[in-house]
Amino acid sequence: PLNTEVTAVLLGSNVGNLVDQLAEYGADKVIVVDDPELETYRTEPYAHALAEVINKYKPEIMLVGATAIGRDLGPTVSARVATGLTADCTLLEIGDFPLVAIPGKEQKHNQLLMTRPAFGGNTIATIACPDNRPQMATVRAGVMQKAEPKPGAKAEVIEFNPGFTPNNKYVEIMDVVKKVAETVNIMDAKILVSGGRGVGSKENFKILEDLAEALDGTVACSRAVTDNGWLPVDRQVGQTGKTVRPQVYFAIGISGAIQHVAGMEE
């Protein structure tokens, strides 16, 4: 364990009401950057704000959600503060690097060891950033279990103003069009009926859908199924899909490759 404080960074406009929620979920401190320039996500002002926070407070580790925004913001910020970033991590651990001591090479302790799929999901890599700070990673939703909130918990609030100077990198948002799509959140399902290439065809998934309906469950799948276009990617379980924690998991026609098992082993 690092025996250190956890600090959340809250970026946005009129977001002060979220501080207590962050405290209840474990933040010891909350750095708040509240500015009209952050009303809608744009890469430049958000990257500037977060980079300035890092430059001032110099954290050892900076974690960002591997969401659509996080996958844009994380790499931009890491480049600005001259450090590395490991994207789409499926496991985070604290340990020694190199993992095994090498004669003549210093083994550094309390390093963030970041595990993620590599080479198209065909192998798993554990990556460290021993020489630069902060150690940065984006972490996929569902990888870490959501802690139970502690009602009434309070955090130290730090108001921070990075100073915004609009430049030619600031885009102007003309309009936002939201498309409402029918998606299924398999990460919250208690019962999953998951099919793989062995199911045989898109039509055969009707059998799995009937079983899932009878059990009040949800249909999921392996990567081979989404690659074949039988089901949409929001149903995919695995290192290149979603991490799930159902109470019951039916694996039908799935070979059990390590990349798939990594998404449901807990």
Please name every model-derived segment:
Residues P1-E266:
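N-terminal glycine-rich FAD/FM-binding segment characteristic of electron-transfer flavoproteins
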